[in-house]
Amino acid sequence: MSFNVNWNSLETDSLRSWTVELLTEALNSGKRPNILASDITIKDLNFGKIAPRFEILEIGELDRDRFRGIFKIDYNGDFHLTLHTKVQANPLKIYSDNSLEKEISASSPFVTPDFLLSSDAFNIPLDLKLSDIKISGIGIIVFSKSKGLTMVFRNDPLDSIKVSSTFDTVQVLATFLQNQIENQIRDLFRETLPTLLHKVSLKYTSSNNTNDIIDNLKDHLSNNVYSNALESLEVENVSPGNLQKLAKIYSSRETLKLNVPKLKRIVQRNHLEKFNKNLNPNLASCLYTNMGLQEYSGFSGVSSSYNSIPVGLIANEDFKKVDEILQEISSIQSKNFKSGSNDHKPAKRRTIKLGKGMRQKKVDMQNVDESTLNSINMSRCATEYCDTLSDVSTVLSDDQHNHIEQPTPLKVFTDTRPPLRNVVYTEGYKCSSPMNSNSSFVGSVGLGNNFFQIASGCAPSASPLRNDLSGQKSVHSHDVKVKVKKSMNRIDVSQINEKLNGGFNNGTSKEAMHNENKAFSHNDPSITPFELPPPPYHQLSRA
C-alpha cells in the first residue's frame, strides 16, 4: 500500500513560521559553548517541490482509535536549511572564558598572559547550509487517538547529506563540519524526531488549542539535557575558604609561570618522587616516631638507606622496654618486606624440631625389617606377621603412613624342610671294647651306629617344634627326654658305660684313673683294665 502526499500544502506561512520558531528554540536550548559568539538563527527554510515516498509494508493492528504498522520511507528531494551564527576566532579569548581567572585574579595576578588584544573578541560570521538529503529507512508507527503518534526507526535512515559553510575553502574545517553534522542528524532521527512528531500529533488528537501544544513542546525542548552534571550536585559542608583554595589549586595548573607556587599539605606531581622517599624512612627514625622516644644522638642525620638495628637504643633503654622495642622492630621490618613487591613470599623463620633424628632412625629400621608383603598394604592399620624364620612383629605406625618409603624388594625363601639339629654324642669311656659304641665292631651300618643317633639315646625327628625359635642356645640332647621304641636286639651301651665308670670310681681315685688311662693309651699290658680285642683278620699270620 502506498500513498500520494500533497507536498504543496506544506508551503504555508503559518507552518513555516511555526517550524522556524520551533527549531530555533531547540538549537539554542542549553548552555551555549564558548566557541559560539552568538545564538543560532534560521536564515532560510525550504521544503522543496519533491515529496518523499511513503510505503506501508505491514499493518499489524487497525481500529478506529488505534493503528500499528511497518512503513518504508525514501526521500531524495530538494529540501534545504540554512543556519546563521558567529564563531569566536580568538583562541586566547576562548581559553580565558573557560578558565577561572576572574574568581582568583586577586590572589594570582599572572594566571594567563595579558597581551594587547589577547582577551578581545574576534567574531567571524558563519553560514551553514544543509541540502541534498537522502533518506532511506524502515520504521514502526503506532498511532493512538488518546496518546498520539509514535515512530521508531529500525535502521539508520540517513544515507547522505551535503554540508556547505563559509569555511569551505579550508579543507580541514570543511571535513570537520561534515562529520560533526552527519553525527548530529543521525541523533536527530534516532531521538529528536520521534519526540517532535509525538508532540505535533497531539494537535489533531486532542481538543486543546495549538498554543498549548507549542507551549508544551517548548517546555520539553527547553530542558537542559546537556547541562553539566556537576551543576546539579549539591555542595555540602564546603566553606568559602575551601572553595577559594580549590580554585587557587585549579588555576595553578593553568599558569605560564616557571615557578609554580607551593601550597601547604599538597603534593605536586613533579615532587612526587621526594614524597615517596619519605614514605619509607630508615628503621631508626620509624622506631623513634612510633614509640615516641627521643632521637639517639648516634643516629641523627642518618641516610634513609641505613636500616641497621639501633643497638645503642637497646643498650641505653630500660630492660623492661627492650622487649617492646624488639617487637616494634619486627613489625617495621615485616611491613617494609611486604610493601616491597606484590610477589613477596613469607619471611622464613628459624625453627628447631626436636626428636626428628630419632623418628627418622625408627622409620629407617622399620623399613629395613619390612618385607615386600608388608609394603603392599598401604592402609592405616596395624599388621603382625610371624614366620618360622623370625618372630618379629611389624606394626605400621602413623608416622610411616604419612611418609611411606618403598623398601627394596627382598627375596623370601621358606624352607619346607627344617634344618638338621646338631648331633650330640654321649661321651663314653675311651676304650676299644667291643661293647663300646665307638668300637670298630659296631662302626658299620647297623645297630649302635652313631650316625642314626640310636646309641646316644636321641631318635631322629623332623618336627619343627624342637627348633630354636628365639635364637637362644640349643638345648643339650641329654636334657631332653625322648621316648624311643626299644628293639629286642638292642644293646644298651649307656648302662654298660655307667657300670664300668661306677666300678672304676669306687675302687680308685682320680689320679689312679688318670694313670690307668695314660697307660691304656700307651698300650701298657701291665695295667690293662680288661682283655684287648683280637686283631683284625688282615693282621693275622697266615698258617
UniProtKB/Swiss-Prot annotation:
Residues 1-202 form the SMP-LTD domain. One of its GO terms (molecular function) is lipid binding. InterPro entries: Mdm34, SMP_LBD. Keywords: Lipid transport, Lipid-binding, Membrane, Mitochondrion, Mitochondrion outer membrane, Transmembrane, Transmembrane beta strand, Transport. It comes from the Eukaryota. It is found in: Mitochondrion outer membrane. GO terms for cellular component: ERMES complex. It is a multi-pass membrane protein. Residues 519-543 are annotated as: Disordered. GO terms for biological process: mitochondrial genome maintenance; mitochondrion-endoplasmic reticulum membrane tethering; phospholipid transport. PANTHER family: MITOCHONDRIAL DISTRIBUTION AND MORPHOLOGY PROTEIN 34. Belongs to the MDM34 family. Lacks alpha-helical transmembrane segments, suggesting that it resides in the membrane via beta-sheet conformations similar to those predicted for other outer membrane proteins and porin. Component of the ERMES/MDM complex, which serves as a molecular tether to connect the endoplasmic reticulum (ER) and mitochondria. Components of this complex are involved in the control of mitochondrial shape and protein biogenesis, and function in nonvesicular lipid trafficking between the ER and mitochondria. MDM34 is required for the interaction of the ER-resident membrane protein MMM1 and the outer mitochondrial membrane-resident beta-barrel protein MDM10. Component of the ER-mitochondria encounter structure (ERMES) or MDM complex, composed of MMM1, MDM10, MDM12 and MDM34. This is Mitochondrial distribution and morphology protein 34. It comes from Clavispora lusitaniae (strain ATCC 42720). The gene is MDM34.
